[in-house]
């Protein structure tokens, strides 16, 4: 009777991190619930299932939904938790499990509650949010064993099935959903039967947006399919992304360069200001009496009444920003010149997609063409190549014995879901022949450290600050997704067109098998970028990434110099332990160097998060260093 299967399903589990040094990762597992235990198996296609863990139901102290306030970094978005008592070590540990949909999660939680509600060791309070970065997100307590902050009711919804809907409720549930229209910002060509081709500026019905990176849409002829969400934007008169003059997250320095390169009187753009939700109009003019043309910046102000209205010059107030821009395209109205030529950088080139096609992460060898070797890294050689002879890609061939391949393959699909304009996109893996290959977005100018050294003496301080901003944007995204880089440095960032910098190789050091690189005593271990808690205890967190980011900023503002110059690893450890920090680079302002020093606080909790660093750097950039 105890072996009777109550539920079985493929779910995703988060590593339990029973040791402080254990990595935080997500793995697909096949879960089986019986009257006696909750077991999970490794389930690979064509292979026998392997038991990876089993929990006696009698030891479960709590089963509950996790009310998350963060982006879930795996493709199952419905988390629940079990708190388990381990009699052997007299300790508690959490098992976070992610279901594919709300119904699946509800089914597992209700069944587990029913089977455990009479356990002797149930808790009276639990934590409704995640334990993350050394604290509970729900109540900010800093001890993992801390008593919960919300009452736990083991019987709530456990044994009672919901009442059937009334006829009125039933009719309501079958009402047609309100139609949402989206607009394509780019063309998207595809031959995949699961997908739908897009034409720039055409409208589509949004059918399903539950997947972050791929939306299901329908065209005006009734054809349906998936398309990359980064190519689409919701249709709304106040959605600025539909307008050719809007540049979402461009820095002041890059905006000025674009407008100066245009060189046309009245060339303009609207961009995000440093305060979230506010905007700036930047316009090029030759009208001011001076030898050189210049860029003027106007903050778009808001009225205090409701609904808000917008203006640049107080005499001319409008109900929306598009109406304000439309007026000033025909009238100066207090501006140095009227807005004549819209300038937009981000619509010139379509963004990368999360995967080369919808649902595709395994790439066939016949689909890849190798062109030339362009570098080498910790895992092996890197080649420029093409996918299906048309999409330029970077292909990393993995040297035998360099990587824990099985562990990486388990997480590759999850890593592909990480997609951001300032991250180098992993497109997929090629597994069917040795050596295995990783297929990445191709970045034109190679790694940042080499680029800085090759162009030394040619950079303005504003340009270097823009590079740091790019990296910080990517790291703020990883921080929000609860992903630790573990090896952030200029060598692991890549340079693309228009000097856009993207973070690469995030989390990859978890799969390195070379002890000389992964052990803090190894000759290849990157001590010069490591925080004190990393080289002393191998304790990684987003705050250890912040320390590394401070060193990366130093690399950038010293135009590619090696930190701590000729000091050995042991000397660096000794210096840092006695309070020594890197000197201020010549091109770094006092404000910039102050941020570096904030990153190098000895205690991790004293270092700012990337979200705060991003705001501080943006403020410095807007103020002109």
Curated annotation (Swiss-Prot):
Residues 177-237 form the SH3 domain. A zinc finger (Btk-type) spans 119-155. ATP binds at residues 374-382, 396. Residues 368-620 form the Protein kinase domain. It comes from the Eukaryota. GO terms for cellular component: cell-cell junction; cytosol; nucleus. InterPro entries: ITK_PTKc (IPR042785), ITK_SH3 (IPR035583), Kinase-like_dom_sf (IPR011009), Non-receptor_tyrosine_kinases (IPR050198), PH-like_dom_sf (IPR011993), PH_domain (IPR001849), Prot_kinase_dom (IPR000719), Protein_kinase_ATP_BS (IPR017441). One of its GO terms (molecular function) is zinc ion binding. Residues 4-117 form the PH domain. Its main location: cytoplasm. Its EC number is 2.7.10.2. Residues 153-174 are annotated as: Disordered. Homooligomerizes; this association negatively regulates kinase activity. Interacts with PPIA/CYPA; this interaction regulates TCR signal strength via a proline-directed conformational switch in ITK. Interacts with THEMIS. Interacts with FASLG. Interacts with VAV1; this interaction is important for VAV1 localization and TCR-induced actin polarization. Interacts with TBX21. The N-terminal PH domain allows ITK to be recruited to the plasma membrane by an activated PI3 kinase. This domain also contains a proline-rich region (PRR). The adjoining domain is a SH3 domain, which binds to PRR (from itself or from other proteins). Next, a SH2 domain is required for binding tyrosine-phosphorylated substrates. In the C-terminal region, the kinase domain is required for tyrosine phosphorylation. Belongs to the protein kinase superfamily. Tyr protein kinase family. TEC subfamily. This is Tyrosine-protein kinase ITK/TSK. The lineage of its organism: Eukaryota, Metazoa, Chordata, Craniata, Vertebrata.
């Amino acid at each position: 009777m105890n072996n009777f299967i109550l539920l079985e399903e493929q779910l995703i589990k988060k590593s339990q991190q029973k040791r402080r040094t254990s990595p935080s990762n997500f793995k697909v597992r096949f879960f089986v619930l019986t009257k006696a235990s909750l077991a999970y198996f490794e389930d690979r296609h064509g292979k026998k299932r392997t038991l990876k863990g089993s929990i006696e139901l009698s030891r479960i102290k709590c089963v509950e939904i996790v009310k998350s306030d963060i982006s879930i970094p795996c493709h199952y978005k419905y988390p629940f938790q079990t708190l388990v008592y381990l009699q052997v070590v007299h300790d508690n540990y959490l098992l976070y499990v992610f279901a594919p949909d709300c119904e699946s999660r509800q089914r597992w939680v209700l069944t587990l509650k029913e089977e455990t509600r009479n356990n002797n060791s149930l808790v009276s309070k639990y934590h409704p949010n995640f334990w993350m970065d050394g604290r509970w997100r729900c109540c900010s307590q800093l001890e993992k064993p801390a008593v919960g902050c919300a009452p736990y009711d083991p019987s709530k919804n456990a044994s009672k099935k919901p009442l059937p809907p009334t006829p009125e409720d039933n009719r309501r549930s079958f009402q047609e959903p309100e139609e949402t229209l989206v607009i394509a910002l780019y063309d998207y060509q595809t031959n995949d039967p699961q997908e739908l081709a897009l034409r720039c500026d055409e409208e589509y019905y949004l059918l399903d947006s539950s997947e972050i990176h791929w939306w299901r849409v329908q065209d005006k002829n009734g054809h349906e399919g998936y398309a990359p969400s980064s190519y689409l934007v919701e249709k709304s008169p106040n959605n600025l992304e539909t307008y050719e003059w809007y540049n979402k997250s461009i820095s002041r320095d890059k905006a000025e360069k674009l407008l100066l390169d245009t060189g046309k009187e009245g060339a303009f753009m609207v961009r995000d200001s440093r305060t979230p939700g506010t905007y700036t109009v930047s316009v090029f003019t030759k009208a001011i009496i001076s030898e050189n043309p210049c860029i003027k910046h106007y903050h778009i102000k808001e009225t205090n009444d409701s609904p808000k209205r917008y203006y640049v010059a107080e005499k001319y107030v409008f109900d929306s920003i598009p109406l304000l821009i439309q007026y000033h395209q025909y009238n100066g109205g207090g501006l140095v010149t009227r807005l004549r030529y819209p300038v937009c950088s981000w619509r010139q080139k379509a963004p990368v997609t999360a995967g080369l096609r919808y649902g595709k992460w395994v790439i066939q060898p016949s689909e890849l063409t190798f062109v030339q070797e362009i570098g080498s890294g910790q895992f092996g050689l890197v080649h420029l190549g093409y996918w299906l002879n048309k999409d330029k890609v970077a292909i990393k061939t993995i040297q035998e014995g360099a990587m824990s391949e099985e562990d990486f393959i388990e997480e590759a699909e999850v890593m592909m879901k990480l997609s951001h304009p300032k991250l180098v996109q992993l497109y997929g893996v090629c597994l069917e022949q040795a050596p295995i290959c990783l297929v990445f977005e191709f970045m034109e100018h190679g790694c940042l450290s080499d680029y800085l050294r090759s162009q030394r003496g040619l950079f303005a301080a504003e340009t270097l600050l823009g590079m740091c901003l790019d990296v910080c944007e990517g790291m703020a995204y990883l921080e929000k997704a609860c992903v630790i880089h573990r090896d952030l440095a200029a060598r692991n960032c890549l340079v693309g067109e228009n000097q856009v910098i993207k973070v690469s190789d995030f989390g990859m050091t978890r799969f390195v098998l070379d002890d000389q690189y992964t052990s803090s005593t190894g000759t290849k271990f990157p001590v010069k970028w490591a925080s004190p808690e990393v080289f002393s205890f191998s304790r990684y967190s987003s705050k250890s990434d912040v320390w590394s980011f401070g060193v990366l900023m130093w690399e950038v503002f010293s135009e590619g110099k090696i930190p701590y110059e000729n000091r050995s690893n042991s000397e660096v450890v000794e210096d840092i332990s006695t309070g020594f920090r890197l000197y201020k680079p010549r091109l770094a302002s006092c404000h910039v160097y102050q941020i570096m020093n904030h990153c190098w606080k000895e205690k991790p909790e004293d270092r700012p998060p990337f979200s705060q660093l991003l705001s501080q750097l943006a403020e410095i950039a807007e103020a002109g260093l």
